[in-house]
Design a protein with these regions (language model features):
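Active-site rim helix/loop that mediates acceptor-substrate recognition in acyltransferases
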Residues: 11, 16-61, 153-178
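Amide-forming acyltransferase catalytic core, primarily the GNAT-like/NAT-type
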Residues: 120-205
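Conserved GNAT acetyl-CoA-binding A-motif
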Residues: 89, 96-109, 216-225
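Non-catalytic positions within long, well-ordered alpha-helices that form the structural scaffold/packing
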Residues: 97, 118, 211-215
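Conserved beta-strand in the GNAT
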Residues: 44, 50-60, 67-74, 105, ...
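Conserved acetyl-CoA pyrophosphate-binding loop and the N-cap/start of the following alpha-helix
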Residues: 79-91, 206-210
Length: 251
């Protein structure tokens, strides 16, 4: 089993592996590979040229430090329970360290994964809050481009927040939308008559009015806060500074 950056001829295998691992639609997968994927931000394990597993990340920044947001690890069903996830995680840490990254972030989706990543050197560092609400009287808002969203987000981010721009926002915009109001900034995904506020910065009390303005009956929002455990962090050099807020989590 060899671990390396993927080649161009392996991309169709990576697409198939993603679908087998996560069950996403062809449209979603096409969006990721068109706007979020980069061979230099992927490590894949292959046996005789056949891709068995792959790890993907996005670049991020915190107080001048270069971070990697480890987004996904996909393993082919035929190669599961062979330690490939752990091998890819170890390889990624070594690779990122060699390329001058200061730290790595990831977001576990359950307590079991949180414990597993803890054994790999990751520790809890960030928190978030979430809430649901019904629609209220509409507030003024407007759609914004990813460039304007990036500029405004730097103004709204908490002082201990991670900057996520470039490919992060290009990919996010393939399935979500960006909005700005007088005192808030929102990245949101439409889901039938419900809205998922992936990140609401600024005035969280505007949430019911946001739903009213966009025509949704109810929604669920993630905001800065301390109610829930968030991202985990692994320093890749001595003295790397850990963030306290990591908001754009690609669920």
């Amino acid at each position: 089993m060899e671990i390396d950056y993927p080649t161009g001829v392996q991309e169709p295998q990576l697409r198939m592996l993603w679908q087998l691992s996560f069950g996403d639609s062809e449209e979603f997968i096409a969006g990721f590979f068109a706007s979020g994927y980069c061979p230099r931000r992927c490590r894949c394990a292959a046996e005789n040229g056949n891709v068995a597993a792959a790890l993907y990340w996005f670049d991020a920044e915190f107080r001048g430090q270069k971070f990697a947001y480890l987004y996904a690890v996909a393993t082919h069903p035929d190669f599961r329970n062979r330690g490939l996830c752990r091998a890819l995680m170890a390889d990624a840490a070594a690779c990122l360290t060699g390329r001058g990254y200061d730290g790595a972030l990831l977001m576990p989706h359950d307590s079991g994964l949180r414990k597993m990543y803890g054994r790999m050197g990751y520790r809890d560092c960030c928190t978030v809050s979430e809430f649901s609400c019904e629609a209220g009287e509409a507030v003024a808002l407007r759609p914004v481009s990813d460039a304007e969203f990036a500029r405004l987000r730097r103004e709204y981010l908490p002082p201990d927040g991670v900057i996520q721009e470039g490919a992060n926002l290009s990919y996010l915009k393939s399935y979500a939308a960006f909005y700005a109001g007088g005192d808030f900034l929102l990245a949101a995904e439409h889901d039938g008559d419900s809205l998922t506020g992936m990140e609401l910065l600024g005035n969280a009390a505007a949430a019911p009015g946001i739903l009213g303005a966009l025509g949704f009956s109810h929604g669920h929002f993630r905001t800065p806060g301390t109610a829930l455990p968030g991202a985990m962090f692994r320093p890749l050099r001595p003295g790397a500074d850990a963030p306290g807020y990591f908001g754009l989590i690609f669920d």
